[in-house]
A protein has these predicted regions:
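Accessory recognition modules or surfaces
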Residues: 9-10, 34-40, 44-47, 76-90
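Active-site nucleotide-donor binding segment shared across nucleotidyl transfer reactions
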Residues: 13-44, 49, 55, 130
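Residue-level detector of beta-strand structural context in well-folded domains
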Residues: 15, 80-81, 116-117
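Helical scaffold of the NTase/Pol beta-like nucleotidyltransferase catalytic core
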Residues: 1-25, 155-158
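Catalytic cores of NTP-dependent nucleotidyl/adenyl transfer enzymes across multiple folds
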Residues: 104-158
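Anion (oxyanion) recognition and catalysis
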Residues: 18, 84, 120
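Conserved catalytic core of two-metal-ion nucleotidyltransferases
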Residues: 66-100
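Short amphipathic alpha-helices in soluble, non-transmembrane regions
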Residues: 56-63
Length: 158
């Protein structure tokens, strides 16, 4: 589910953020995998507070594909920076002012790094968006992969 190359990048991200005292949470597919989803990991999604975006930009400047920007499409409206670390795509999102669109409605996502749960993959420990919020988010998005993730997450006791 999580290939060694992606685990190596995950370790680097976690070590860098922790060493520089930047609170964060993992969300998206990796978050779902820690709660029992069985799909292959495409990218790594990390959320940080707005106050740490500039610091993160400096720390990861050598890996930036797209700098922090307002990203908006038919599904999302949020601030994010995209990195490529050793071929692994990484999205670092600002946790505040993040929205999804559902049935034409713009919905504000929970703000702040609250109620995270410490999870681990092969001894790599990191805070993950809490299961309820992640399941709710994936169900609201309604994409096939997200619905499968939500179903698998709910079916496990992880």
């Amino acid at each position: 589910m999580v290939p060694e190359a992606k685990k190596k990048v995950l370790r680097f991200l976690i070590d860098t953020l922790n060493k520089n005292n930047i609170p964060f949470q993992v969300s998206g597919g990796l978050g779902a995998i820690t709660y029992g989803a069985t799909r292959e990991l495409r990218d790594i999604d990390i959320e940080i507070n707005k106050e740490n975006c500039q610091k993160a930009r400096e720390l990861f400047k050598d890996y930036i594909v797209e700098d922090f920007r307002r990203y908006s499409d038919e599904e999302f409206d949020l601030w994010m920076m995209t990195l490529d670390i050793d071929g692994v795509p990484v999205d670092i999102n600002q946790v505040e002012e993040s929205y999804i669109f559902k049935d034409g409605e713009k919905i504000l996502l929970p703000e702040g790094l609250i109620d995270t749960e410490m999870k681990s993959i092969d001894g790599i420990e990191f805070p993950v968006q809490n299961k309820k919020n992640l399941v709710d988010y994936k169900q609201m998005l309604g994409r096939d992969t997200d619905l499968t993730d939500a179903t698998e997450m709910l079916a496990t006791g992880q």
